A protein has these predicted regions:
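Alpha-helical transmembrane segments of multi-pass membrane proteins
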Residues: 54-65, 259, 280, 287-292, ...
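Hydrophobic core segments of alpha-helical transmembrane domains in multi-pass membrane proteins
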Residues: 83-92, 288, 310-317
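Membrane-embedded alpha-helices of multi-pass membrane proteins, especially ion channels
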Residues: 1-8, 29-44, 62-75, 91-103, ...
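Membrane-lumen (extracellular) interface motif
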Residues: 1-24, 40-54, 69-85, 176-212, ...
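Membrane-interfacial catalytic/cofactor-binding modules of polytopic membrane enzymes
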Residues: 119-165, 170, 187-304, 332-369
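Intramembrane catalytic core of multi-pass membrane enzymes that act on lipidic substrates
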Residues: 16-167
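Compositionally biased, low-complexity linear motifs
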Residues: 150-156, 308-319
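Juxtamembrane/interfacial segments flanking transmembrane helices
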Residues: 104-109, 236-241, 327
Length: 369
């Protein structure tokens, strides 16, 4: 170990300090927005308001569910980890509320068409109830539907083993951050300033521990935590990711690595764009734009620094997808596209973003960590 043993609890303890209590209270109050959406849908089902009013109210509710946490984070001097956690919860709530509104809108339209005599042989009746919404809000899915596949029982022994794995790999992730990433970042320069060769050396040196942390994060979140949540709720659909590590193109990677978000994007962004006559390329551009906005919110708001590095990083995936598609079509039997993905996305892209945000935050704070 080049820097000696550097394990400490400061990084994690900072996220449980008294100054972060407003963020905890904000997180605990987020369920008010699903409750408001439920009341709107209940009134809409009873025809107490027009469709225009329903859509307007849902826009207000979903917008408030994002702006409220943003304002709380910006007003409080909270730790970065606490801010990221709150923003991720807020983004999940926003996506679930959009899906809830879209699905109920479709069900109302189908019910009305049946009442008017169209497809009268099919029963499109549905019930807006708080139980289904509550289950959806805690289930490991972003797409609302009236029912989900359910497992027969909860495997308690399996659940205990997964909890142990979660503790172990979370600890490993913290160890790598404290022992390797923090010293490298603190001894680095701004990647867009100073000596070019030294900057490249820092990025490449950071790439290995950063990759390990990212893989640990993926394993903890998608393989362990979402399966734990699914097991507790007896949620039957466990397809949270596919073999993204074998992706030969960037767009294939984005279709495989985060299945809940991918399914949400396809159902609520991509297909609605196509149904409204937009070309496929424009639909893809809109999907990446929305993804870029939320990536930027999850990083920039906790940093209180809007330099749009995360936004640009996601939007850069579009030309990178075109490049990897070209390479895959030209060299069909090679893994050149896969190597390009690993190089640009994992080895260069993520360490660059870490260094950019770190040094911009340090510059804003006058160099104090």
């Amino acid at each position: 170990m080049q820097y000696g043993l550097l394990i400490g609890s400061g990084f994690w303890r900072s996220s449980t300090s008294v100054r972060d209590w407003p963020l905890l209270m904000c997180c605990l109050s987020l369920p008010i927005f699903p409750l408001a959406a439920f009341l709107v849908e209940k009134l809409a089902q009873k025809n107490y308001m027009t469709e225009y009013v329903v859509v307007t109210l849902h826009i207000i509710i979903t917008t408030a569910s994002i702006l409220y946490p943003v304002l709380v984070i910006l007003r409080c001097d909270a730790a970065f980890l606490s801010g990221v956690t709150l923003m991720m919860f807020a983004c999940i709530v926003w996506m679930k509320l959009v899906s809830y509104a879209h699905t109920n809108y479709d069900m109302r339209q189908l019910a009305r068409s049946a009442d008017e005599g169209e497809n009268s042989e099919i029963n499109y009746s549905y019930d807006v109830n708080i139980k289904s919404l509550a289950y959806f809000m805690v289930a490991p899915t972003l797409c609302y539907q009236l029912s989900y596949p359910r497992s027969a029982s909860i495997r308690k022994g399996w659940l205990a083993r997964q909890l142990i794995k979660l503790v172990i790999f979370t600890g490993l992730m913290g160890f790598i951050i404290e022992q390797y990433i923090n010293p490298i970042v603190r001894s680095s320069q701004h990647p867009l300033k100073g000596d070019l060769l030294y900057g490249i050396e820092r990025v490449l040196k950071l790439s290995v521990p950063n990759l390990y942390v990212w893989l640990c994060m993926f394993y903890c979140l998608f393989h362990i935590w979402l399966n734990i949540l699914a097991e507790i709720l007896r949620f039957g659909d466990r397809e949270f990711y596919k073999d993204w590590w074998n992706a030969k193109t960037i767009d294939e990677y984005w279709r495989l690595w985060n299945m809940p978000v991918h399914k949400w994007m396809v159902r609520h962004i991509y297909f609605p764009c196509l149904r409204n006559g937009l070309p496929k390329g424009v639909a893809v551009l809109i999907s990446f734009f929305i993804s870029a906005v939320f990536h930027e919110l999850c990083i920039a708001v906790p940093c209180r620094l809007f330099k749009f590095w995360a936004f640009l990083g996601i939007m850069f995936q579009i030309p990178l997808a075109i490049l990897t598609n070209f390479l895959q079509n030209k060299f069909k039997s090679s893994n050149l596209g896969n190597m390009t993905f690993w190089c640009f996305f994992c080895i260069v892209g993520q360490p660059m973003c870490v260094l950019l945000y770190y040094h911009d935050v340090m510059n804003r704070n006058g160099g104090s960590s």
